[in-house]
């Protein structure tokens, strides 16, 4: 029934189907998730599900993984352009005094969106404001855009100097881009996990050497750094994409 998709897609012609496999259970001991979990994986890449399962089997033999989700932030970064540097610098000094007003403006747009911080940076005649929000259980992309619009509109009449022009998003937030901002702040939920893999387990079940694996990671990290890569992990993109697709994201 295409009418159910009104507002969600244009030029609708049908659906794409991707096969979904499952791997698990995997044992997780987290601050919020604690137990054994089955992981859905949408893919046509042969051996991906099997690789998950092989890893989970070894993880479970080591007692599972420890995990924590310690931040949940979504950013928007407006910028204001002024006639010259001294004017912009004056605004950069003034903006931190308006944080409570920014919070009130953001809160007026949503029951869930709350402004957590505002980080100011000055580049030439332009002031950038990195606004970070908590958005409850929502991804919050539209939510934080509306909140940022309200914040800017509340600030503009009070500014000691009127900007030549301004943008609701300057790309400083890192939205839809691989950037260091994800490490410096957060882009959604910030999660960490830890597992200790004894050398004897690695040797028995992976037929590998722990020291050789560590050396490989070190060398690959240096290689990735030469390309300017932001992520230094071992090819998690395929697995994450498969998980996101299976979960409807």
What function would you assign to each model-found segment?
Residues 9, 23-27, 40, 77-83, ...:
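Short glycine-rich or small-residue beta-strand-to-loop segments that form or flank ligand, phosphate
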Residues 69-71, 77-152:
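Intrinsically disordered, low-complexity linker/loop segments enriched in Gly/Pro
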Residues 54-99, 103, 177-218:
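A structural-propensity feature for long, helix-poor, extended segments
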Residues 38-68, 99-106, 239, 244-248:
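Long, charge-patterned amphipathic alpha-helical coiled-coil/hairpin "stalk" segments used as oligomerization
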Residues 133-249:
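Glycine-rich anion/phosphate-binding loop at the beta-strand->alpha-helix junction
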Residues 24-28, 37-41, 127, 183-197:
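Short beta-strand elements
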Residues 29, 35-37, 47-52, 89-91, ...:
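Short helix/loop capping segments that flank catalytic or ligand/cofactor-binding pockets
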């Amino acid at each position: 029934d295409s009418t159910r998709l009104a507002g969600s897609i244009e030029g609708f012609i049908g659906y794409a189907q991707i096969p979904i496999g499952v791997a698990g259970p995997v044992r997780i001991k987290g601050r919020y998730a604690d137990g054994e979990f089955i992981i859905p994986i949408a893919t046509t890449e042969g051996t991906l599900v099997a690789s998950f399962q092989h890893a989970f089997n070894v993880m479970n033999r080591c007692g599972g993984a420890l995990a924590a989700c310690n931040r949940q932030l979504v950013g928007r970064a407006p910028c204001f352009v002024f006639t010259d540097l001294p004017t912009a610098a004056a605004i950069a000094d003034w903006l931190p005094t308006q944080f409570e007003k920014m919070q009130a403006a953001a809160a007026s747009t949503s029951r869930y969106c709350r402004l957590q911080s505002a980080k100011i940076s000055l580049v030439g005649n332009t002031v950038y404001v990195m606004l970070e929000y908590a958005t409850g259980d929502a991804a919050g992309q539209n939510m934080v855009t509306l909140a940022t619009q309200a914040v800017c509109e509340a600030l503009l009449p009070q500014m000691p100097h009127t900007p030549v022009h301004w943008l609701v998003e300057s790309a400083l937030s890192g939205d839809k881009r691989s950037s260091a901002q994800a490490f410096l702040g957060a882009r959604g939920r910030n999660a960490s996990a830890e597992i200790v893999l004894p050398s004897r387990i690695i040797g028995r079940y992976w037929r590998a050497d722990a020291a050789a694996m560590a050396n490989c990671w070190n060398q690959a990290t240096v290689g990735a750094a030469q390309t300017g890569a932001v992520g230094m992990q071992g090819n998690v993109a395929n697995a994450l994409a498969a998980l996101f697709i299976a979960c409807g994201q």
